[in-house]
Amino acid sequence: MDYEFLRDVTGGVKVRMSMGHEVVGHWFNEEVKDNLSLLDEVEQAARTVKGSERSWQRAGHEYTIWMDGEEVMIRANQLDFSGDEMEEGMSYYDEESLSLCGMEDFLRVVAAYREFVSKA
């Protein structure tokens, strides 16, 4: 899982992720932004579910993050609509609306994000 952190013209941090993990970047860009307390909450939840059968979920404005002891899933909240709402012959492209990654990989990105933000 490759990633890149950038600063926009206003100084805000933007995250770009490798193909297949774009939604993780969108989650950082839309849900986290400068809200490092959200990362505190996510890291605490990761410690709670790690090595257990439990899972944790937090719905944000645009994306929901879900994790269990081994993996993290981030999905766009818009995925909640049913296929019955689409016209016949149409399919919904959701490759950039759902990402799965390992817990350790995700926590490495969180740590790198914190480090990048702190160098402002």
From Swiss-Prot:
Record organism: Salmonella typhimurium (strain LT2 / SGSC1412 / ATCC 700720)
Stored Pfam families: UPF0231
InterPro entries named in the record: UPF0231
Protein name: UPF0231 protein YacL
Disulfide bonds: none
NCBIfam families documented for this protein: PRK05248.1-1 (NF003574), PRK05248.1-3 (NF003576)
Family label: Belongs to the UPF0231 family.
Superkingdom of source: Bacteria
